[in-house]
Amino acid sequence: MNEAKEFNEAVEEKTDGVKEVLDSIDDNNVDSDLEYEFPAGYYDKENGKLIKDFEIREMTGADEEALAGVAKKNKGAKIINKALERCLVRIGNMTEKSVGGIDAWGKIIQSLCVPDQDFAIAQIQKVSVEDEIESSHVCPECGQKIRTFFKLDELEVEPYRGETEQVELFELPRGYKDKKGVLHKSGVIRLPNGLDREIVLPVAKTNLSKGTTLMLTRLCTFDDGYPMTESVLREISLKDRRYLENLNKEMLSFGIDLSVDVECNNCGSVFKGSINSLSFQ
């Protein structure tokens, strides 16, 4: 999920089949007594309040059917949002019913930052399927394909040390000079959320650089109001671009650490790999 952690994919589209299953599920028929805390938390902008506690339930057969429809379209990040929309039953005092229904709840789920989403998905997988993840890697030394298994409990969770508002200030080393000769250098960058991942991931899978450009246009805002467009990000110096990319990576260095040590049985070398996804298979 490393790629998904840095960039990510598509607009909310609900098929009639999935909507039918969503409407038919009865949350009273499943246990919902599994409580956790997000590493960063949901920031309620209206009230200036940070909410960290949340509650999940175990997945059902209806959930599996609904997610299978999304998986068929090969929409990895949308599966995460859909699974959370269904199985994350409470954030603070908010529930699907209290916020006005599935559409409003879905937007709240999409607004959760990526590391918080990944943390919640890991807990849902642990109680619903199993505590073990299978991951595939290729040895960089000999090219051997390796299948490895990891326990979810073995993955470290790094604490969030950033701002409550989940933004950081930036100051570009060189800055962007517009057609009027005005220099734009400073602004804010926020953490990527589930909607960012949904929109950007398909682009990043095809062209990683374009995915990075799209993600940064969504995350960055100049403090003077000048729009941070794709053309701006293509015209700024590589030094400025790398600065924003690295700042984004630093901001994302919390939550579940998906990097693992992998040993090659063929040549014996040990290398750092990443767990690409948490699936419900």
Question: PLM features: residue spans?
Answer:
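Short, surface-exposed, charged amphipathic helix/loop patches that serve as local interaction elements
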Residues: 2-281
